[in-house]
Every structure is written in C-alpha cells, then in structure tokens.
Amino acid sequence: MIRHSCRALRFVRSFHDYNSDILKFVASNTLISDSAVYKGKLYELTVQRELYNKLRIGQLDVVGGAHDGGVDIKALWNLFPIFQCALDAGVIKEPSLPLKGTRINDTLVKPLVNQYDIKNKIAPSIEVLVQCKAYVSKISPKEIRELAGTYLSLTAKNKASLSTIPIMCSPQLPTSSSLKLLEKLNIPFLYLRINTLRHGSLNDFELTNTGQLMGYLMNPILKGYLEGSGFEEWMKFELYNNAMNHSQDKDFI
C-alpha cells in the first residue's frame, strides 16, 4: 500500500508555471508556427515542464545555440526529495549504507545514495545535460553517440564523471540498435519519451493530456548509480502525481 505523503519536497522559491510560458510563446509566434525553429522551441518548453514537474529538476538553464555542443538545457538535479518521498510513501526502505559498488561495462559504479547524509537530509546534486529531439522518426544510434560524445568532452577533466548525466528527450522510441548501444555504454544515460503538444477541439494546445512524460529508460550504469535512490519507484508508482499539490505554490531544488 502506497502512502500518499511527500513531506520531502522542500521549497525555496516561487513556483514556475511552464504552461504559462508555453501559452505566451504560442501567442507571440503565430506567424512562424509552421517553422522548424518554432516546433523545436515549443518542444523544448514542453520538456522543461516535464523535467520540472515530473522529475523535480529545478533551475533549468536553456543553453541551446550555435555553440551548444548538442546540449539544449543544463540543470542541477538533487534527488534527495525523491528519495525521501519514496520513503514516506513506503515503497523503499532506508538502506543500510554503504551499498556495494558494481562493475558494469568495465566501469566501477558506486550508488549515489552512499553520499547521502540521510539524518541531515543532505545530498549532492547531479549536473544534467539535456538534449531535445522532436523527431518524427525513431532515435538512431547516431543521435545516442553524439550526445555521449558531448558528455565525454564536457566531463573529460572531471574524474567524478558519474556526477553528470546526459538526458535525451524525444517523442519517439529508440531503435533496437540504439537500445543495444545504450546497454553497452560505459557512461550513465537517461532516455525520456515525452510526446509533443497537440491541438484540442478549439485548436488550442491541450496542455493536460498531451506533451506528457510517457516513459523512461535507464542504461545499466545509470541504474547502478541510482540504486536505492527511490527514482525507479518514483517513476513506477508516479509519485510525482502524489506530490503535485505540494509544488503548486513553491519551487524546489
């Protein structure tokens, strides 16, 4: 039985309404609504909304541009609120730390939760590098390799490279070849399937039932890194819906 309580969501600023951002963008850009630039920006805003509301990633910094290195959004992600929420809901138990590291694809992976100060509710934040791919076709190995290459170039001087995670967002699924590649990567990788916004009966965008997080995939290294963090349970039981009322007037990190 899941307890519907998420006392962990600790807030620091005013809540950001991405639906308002989306509506303002649409109203201000009607003349270019058929362009690739418009569609790309609209999907980027949709992704920001889902990262913020569903994964509790705050302080999203849009960096996309000519010299973005393939990254559209950067942010810091603190998973402790998700961990505490999963504890409150009774879907995980407080781990007996430290959890053992595991060698995956020739990489020693030590769970992030080992770095948590559970008593004082302190945990390190992860840097995330987000790429938005509003494609109409499935994501090929080429796209996966490009983001992996960007990750490697940006973390080359960072010995603790697991503290940075690339996230690819697309309305499409990866191809079977892409899935095989993700299994073999020796870096953490999160794939989010977020569909595009669709028009409703009055030709307005349907913000409630479209543009939603439809699923996710963690590769083996990321699964090992987030072992015991409560993230899989947060996603499986959609605990972000239980916590949604707690986030309507405040922001979180």
Curated annotation (Swiss-Prot):
Its main location: mitochondrion. Keywords: Mitochondrion. It is found in: Mitochondrion. The keyword Mitochondrion applies. GO terms for cellular component: mitochondrion. It comes from the Eukaryota. The keyword Transport does not apply. Belongs to the RRG7 family. This is Required for respiratory growth protein 7, mitochondrial. The gene is RRG7.
